[in-house]
Amino acid sequence: MQVEIDAGSGFCFGVTTAISKAEEELAAGGRLYCLGDIVHNGMECERLRRLGLITINHDDLRRLRGAKVLLRAHGEPPETYALAAQNGIDIIDATCPVVLRLQKRIKLRYEQVPGDGAAGDGADRRPQIVIFGKPGHAEVLGLVGQTKGEAIVVASLADVSRLDFSRDIYLYSQTTKSLDEFHLIIDYIRAHIMPGREFRSFDTICRQVANRLPEVRAFAARHDLILFVCGRKSSNGRVLYDECRRVNANTYLIESADEIDFRWLDGVDTVGICGATSTPKWLMDRCLEAIKHYRPEGNA
C-alpha cells in the first residue's frame, strides 16, 4: 500500500510564526498567556499547554495585571490593545501580516467620509463596509472592531440580500474564505446595487489559503482513500475537507491517528493524508506511521 502526505498541507505562515513566538517565549522561562486557542487544533494546543502556554479568554484578560500575553495570528480589535495598555500587559503580537494589512485597510476606509468631508451628515453618507466571513470568528471580530462594530458580516451568498443597495458598498473578505463564493457575492451586489451608487470589492483572501483548494482537489483525486487531519473547530479545515469529499467520496475527517478505522483500508491501494492550514505536520506524520505499522489480524 502506498501512503502519501500532501506536501502542501500544514501550518500557514501566520500560524507558524505565532507558534514559533510562543515556543521562544516559553523556552526563555516565565509565564505566557495566549488570548484564545493559538491554533484551531486541539492536539497542537495540548502540546503547547504541556510546554507551559496558558490559554485565556477576554474575561480573563480583563482581570490580568502586568502579565505577558500572546495575540494569535487571527488578530484582535483595537479594544484589546487598549485594555492591555490599561492593565499593564506586555503584548506579544503574532497577528498574521496578511490580517494586519486587512485591518488597516478597513480602518482607513471607515475613517474616510465620502465627499468633501463637511460636517453634519458624514455618518449618513458613509458607505456600508461589508465583510464576507464567519460571524463570531476571531479574525472577523478583529475586522469588525476596526469599524467600531458598524461593519456588516455576511456568512454566505444567502445573507447578501439584506444589504442596503441604495447606499455605497465596500466589500472585503475574511482571509480564509472561499474565493469562488466571494466572486458570487460580487456578482450579486453588482446586479442589485442602485444606479449612481458605488460598489467596490477588495480581494483580501490569503493566496496561501486560496491556492490550497485546487491543490487539495488534485491530491484527493489521485488516491483511493483520503484521511483529512484537522481540528473540528477549523473553518479552513471544513472548507478543504468538503472539497476533498466532493472529489473523493472515500474521504474521512480525523483529529488524530487514534480515530483511524483500519477497516477503511480494506481493498485500498493508495492513501492520501492531508490537512488544514491549522494542522501540524507532526500530526500527519503520526497518521502515516500508524498505517505503516498496522498489521491486520492473522497477518502479524
Question: What is the predicted role of each segment?
Answer:
Residues 1-300:
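The feature marks the mature, well-folded catalytic cores of soluble enzymes
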